[in-house]
Amino acid sequence: MLGSLPNLVEDSITLGTKAHPSQPNGLSPQGIRSQIQTSLQAMKVSTVNEFYLHQPDDEHSLLDSLKTLNELVEEGTISTIGMSNYHASEVQRAFDLCNEHGLAKPSVYQGLYNPLNRCVEDELLPVLRNNGCSFVAYNPLAAGLLTGKHLAAGEVKEGRFKNNPNYLPRFYTPANFQALELIQSACEEANISMVEASYRWLLRHSALGIDNDDGSGDGVLVGASSLQQLEENLRCCGRAKDAENGKLPQPVLDAFEAAWEIILNDKTSGPFPYWRSYSSDMPGKESLDLGASYNAAKAK
């Protein structure tokens, strides 16, 4: 899409792309170089600001991947190294390897985070903070669950859940819908949409460091399937940033907290994990358990 825009000025916007282990040669040096070249050609640019490892590659070495990313930084092809969907222990290992081998370190992590899934708070975010790495939240509306469109576990409506069945076990769970009822009720009482409440929670009440004095530079990945959705999401973010009125009423905050407790303590599946698999050279990888909800998604 970006490649079709006329006169795209590379330094006028921040460009990011990813390398995925499912592509030919995965996250091997050859695979990473092939994928960055494909992205550059598609966008018709010579460099990108951010280049992410989308998720661990269980067939290739993390160290080899990091060495290749360091070379791309030195060559000027990329500016910033990012990671996504890695376990906290492997993220820490990435920093340790970079320090040991004198490599450019990851400075941004893109991860699953929203009011219905806060798994990164206790485990991942401390690792990022200790290593000066920012966090960008994806799925801020739980893939659309927090829009209020999906309010019955038995009805799969049009959208991401209909078009991507492996998303169903991530969010379409009895615990999530029980939690949604609490949030919906509190939002209706406060006359706030769930979309706006979710963005206000993320930007004003969550563990993210948005515009913090410490410069942590966290962010939220705002998605949309239409221009109308994008405009509404941006308006909600704008209202969240309002110094006087951006914070949520206490009853809505209480509902978000109670909702997360329901999901966190669900014995059937629990919250979907923020990480996927592990690299081939990850020590102790056998002890990492992704849990029932991830296994259910893989079975689809």
Residue ranges of predicted features:
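N-terminal binding-site loop/beta-alpha segment at the start of enzyme catalytic domains
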Residues: 1-14, 298-300
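Conserved, mostly hydrophobic/aromatic
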Residues: 2, 15, 39, 48, ...
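Structural motif corresponding to the early beta-alpha repeats
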Residues: 8, 12-30
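Helix C-cap/helix->beta junction micro-motif
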Residues: 9-11, 75-76, 131, 190
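Glycine-rich beta-alpha junction loops
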Residues: 21, 87, 112-117, 139-146, ...
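Glycine/proline-rich, positively charged
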Residues: 23-119, 123, 133
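Aromatic-lined glycan-binding groove of carbohydrate-active enzymes
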Residues: 120-160, 185, 192-193
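Terminal-tail/helix-coil boundary detector
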Residues: 130, 159-178, 182-185, 189, ...
